[in-house]
């Protein structure tokens, strides 16, 4: 059997409030429910998936630094840091691990300040507006890219 790919899902600020915060935009499911379903999907693909959520930019950066040479792919929903965090972008670039940027809502159909991302130009791809299915799409695409690169 081939070695398992190792993926990390990183979720930024306020995503711990999913299911309570603006369900019309983000849905009624909790982050725990979404990550549990994604972990099951990863298991079926022979992928070792871990996930991490923090409201702290520092904690997110440190977790990214910890992935160096330990993770094959990152799926990140930087949430509000999408529009503000050069430091988080630089952390991703420093570990040189491919990543997908995921957003539950369609950020381009929202307020103008949400249209700019510090990540999209260095991401392998951007998935937005699909709700929790965006994580599944990123998982499948990451596995496909990893399989095709080996």
Curated annotation (Swiss-Prot):
Keyword Amino-acid biosynthesis recorded: yes
GO MF term set: 3-dehydroquinate dehydratase activity
UniProt keyword annotations, A-Z: Amino-acid biosynthesis, Aromatic amino acid biosynthesis, Lyase
EC class: lyase
Residue ranges that the Swiss-Prot or TrEMBL entry lists as coiled coil: none
Keyword Transmembrane: no
PROSITE patterns: DEHYDROQUINASE_II
EC number: 4.2.1.10
Residues reported to bind substrate: 77, 83, 90, 104-105, 114
Residues annotated as site: Transition state stabilizer: 21
GO BP terms, alphabetized: amino acid biosynthetic process; aromatic amino acid family biosynthetic process; chorismate biosynthetic process; quinate catabolic process
Pathway: Metabolic intermediate biosynthesis; chorismate biosynthesis; chorismate from D-erythrose 4-phosphate and phosphoenolpyruvate: step 3/7
Active site feature: 26, 103
A Pfam family it matches: DHquinase_II
Catalysed transformations (reactions): 3-dehydroquinate = 3-dehydroshikimate + H2O
Function: Catalyzes a trans-dehydration via an enolate intermediate.
UniProt similarity note: Belongs to the type-II 3-dehydroquinase family.
Subunit architecture: Homododecamer.
Protein name, per record: 3-dehydroquinate dehydratase
Gene source species: Pseudoalteromonas translucida (strain TAC 125)
Higher taxonomy: Bacteria, Pseudomonadati, Pseudomonadota, Gammaproteobacteria, Alteromonadales
